[in-house]
Amino acid sequence: MYTYSVAKKDGLSKFKIRKGADRKEIQYWRKHHDLHGWMEKLYRQKGGKEQSFNCIPLLLTMEDLANLQKAILTNDLPKTTGFFFGNNPPDEESQKQDLHFIATAMYEISQGRKVYYDSWW
């Protein structure tokens, strides 16, 4: 699971970036299942229809990031389980890392870039 920013022109839609777009990595997570569950819920709210939320870029807005920040600070990420996730509940260190990601992503957006979440397994 990872996030990256692309130039505004390369963010084609909520779920698509231009092929070959230059991606600037923001954050990489390994087995942060509750965060992925939150992102999958957001994907569905934005109209995502694929049964499996995997290898699908998800555009994140300032509002999305503010809502995620609130969920992290109130320990309100959805409990998410599954074969690929294992059992690694969020802790103080992962919370710090998540909040740093949000600040960086907000900065990227403020600089005119688009930020996407993606996963692959």
Q: Residue locations for each model-derived region?
A:
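Acidic (Asp/Glu-rich) sequence patches and key acidic residues
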Residues: 1-121
